[in-house]
C-alpha cells in the first residue's frame, strides 16, 4: 500500500474480494483494514465489504469480521440447489449457504448481499423462481443475479466445447432475465443495474433502491477513481487504467523490492472513454447522466445520437427524461446489442 500514490483522492468504500478472502481469519482481515485506513484518506463511515464463500466461513469468522469493522457482507451463494452447485464446481453445499446466511444475521450483520447465478443448462423458469424465493426469504439488502458465462480456458468452457452439455438457448435466457426483474420487483427490490437489485426500505420512497445499492460497485459504473491491491487487481484514475501481475510470487517479489507490481497500463482515449460511458451508463436503470456526459466530453449526447435515439424511442427501447437517457425495461435484455448501435454510430460533433 505504501507504494501506491493516491494524493488528492478520498475514498468512501473498501472492498475485500474477489478471490476467497474468507479463508483469512478476522485478525488478518483487521490488518488489511488498518493498513488501508492508515495508507489512504477515507470519509467517515465508509462502506466496508468482504466477500464470503459459504464453504470457508464459520460463525466465529463472521463475528470477528463484524468486530474489526466490516459493515457489509457479500455471500457467494450462487444457488440453493445442490445439483447446480455441483455443476458450477463450487466447494460449498446448499446447506452451508443457508447456514452462512443465517449466521451472518445471527452475529449482527444488517447489510447482507447474496450472489446468484442463472442460465444454467436446462434450467427452467420454475427452478429459477425457487432460487429467487429462497433468496428473498432472507430479505437481504442486496441481490446480484448474474447470467452464467463461459470464460475461455475454464473447465466449464472446455466441457461446453467438448459437447458434454448444451448452453441454454438465448430465448430461454431472456425468459429467466425477465423473470428475475418481475419476481424481485414484486418482492420489494429495485433493479438499479442490469444484474443488481437493492431492497426498497419503504413502499413509495427510494423507489430506485438507492439506500441499499452497493456504493462500491457504483464506482465502476460512474468512472469514479478506484485503486486495486493484490494480484490481478485493476485500478483506474482518469484517464489511466492499470492491472497488477497475476502471479502471487511475482507480486510479492515486486512489492518487497519497492516496485509497483503492475503488469501493464493504458491511457484511455476520449473515444474509448465515451464508449465505456455509454455502455456502463446504459447498464444502470437510471441511465446515462446527460449533464455529466456533456461536462466530461463536451458534446450533447442527445444531439450527437439524435437519429438513433429517435429510432429507439419509436421502438420503445429507450427513454430520455429528467436529464438521463435510459433503456426501457423491456429493452434491458438487449443491452449489448443496443450499446453497439451507439458505438458504430457517427458522432455529429465528432469523436
Residue ranges of predicted features:
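Extended hydrophobic-aromatic, low-complexity segments
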Residues: 290-291, 303, 320
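A short, conserved structural fragment
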Residues: 313-323
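Short, charged/polar low-complexity linear motifs in solvent-exposed/disordered segments
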Residues: 245-247, 321, 344-346
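Short amphipathic alpha-helical interaction segments
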Residues: 299-311
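C-terminal scaffold of the Radical SAM
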Residues: 1-299, 350
Amino acid at each position: 500500500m505504501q507504494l501506491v500514490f493516491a494524493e488528492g483522492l478520498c475514498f468512501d468504500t473498501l472492498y475485500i474480494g474477489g478471490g476467497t478472502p474468507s479463508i483469512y481469519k478476522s485478525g488478518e482481515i483487521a490488518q488489511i483494514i488498518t493498513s488501508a485506513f492508515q495508507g489512504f484518506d477515507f470519509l467517515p463511515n465508509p462502506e466496508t465489504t468482504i466477500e464470503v464463500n459459504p464453504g470457508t466461513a464459520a460463525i466465529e469468522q463472521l463475528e470477528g469480521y463484524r468486530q474489526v469493522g466490516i459493515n457489509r457482507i457479500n455471500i457467494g451463494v450462487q444457488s440453493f440447489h445442490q445439483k447446480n452447485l455441483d455443476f458450477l464446481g463450487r466447494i460449498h453445499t446448499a446447506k452451508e449457504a443457508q447456514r452462512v446466511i443465517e449466521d451472518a444475521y445471527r452475529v449482527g450483520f444488517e447489510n447482507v448481499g447474496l450472489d446468484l447465478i442463472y442460465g444454467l443448462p436446462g434450467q427452467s423458469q420454475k427452478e429459477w423462481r425457487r432460487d429467487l424465493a429462497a433468496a428473498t426469504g432472507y430479505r437481504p439488502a442486496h441481490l446480484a443475479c448474474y447470467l452464467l458465462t463461459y470464460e475461455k480456458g475454464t473447465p466449464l468452457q472446455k466441457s461446453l466445447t467438448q459437447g458434454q452439455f448444451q448452453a441454454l438457448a438465448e430465448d430461454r435466457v431472456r425468459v429467466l432475465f425477465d423473470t428475475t426483474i418481475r419476481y424481485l420487483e414484486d418482492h420489494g427490490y429495485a433493479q438499479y443495474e442490469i444484474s443488481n437489485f437493492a431492497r426498497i426500505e419503504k413502499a413509495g420512497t427510494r423507489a430506485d433502491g438507492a439506500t441499499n445499492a452497493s456504493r462500491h460497485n457504483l464506482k465502476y459504473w460512474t468512472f469514479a477513481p478506484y485503486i486495486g491491491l493484490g494480484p490481478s487487481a485493476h485500478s483506474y484514475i482518469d484517464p489511466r487504467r492499470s492491472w497488477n501481475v497475476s502471479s502471487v510470487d511475482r507480486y510479492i517479489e515486486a512489492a518487497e523490492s519497492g516496485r509497483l507490481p503492475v503488469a501493464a497500463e493504458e491511457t484511455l482515449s476520449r473515444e474509448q472513454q465515451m464508449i465505456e460511458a455509454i455502455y456502463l451508463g446504459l447498464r444502470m436503470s437510471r441511465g446515462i447522466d446527460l449533464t455529466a456526459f456533456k461536462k466530461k466530453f463536451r458534446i450533447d449526447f442527445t444531439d450527437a445520437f439524435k437519429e438513433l435515439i429517435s429510432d429507439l424511442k419509436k421502438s420503445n427501447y429507450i427513454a430520455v427524461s429528467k436529464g438521463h437517457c435510459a433503456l426501457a425495461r423491456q429493452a434491458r435484455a438487449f443491452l449489448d446489442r443496443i450499446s453497439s448501435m451507439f458505438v458504430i454510430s457517427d458522432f455529429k460533433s465528432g469523436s
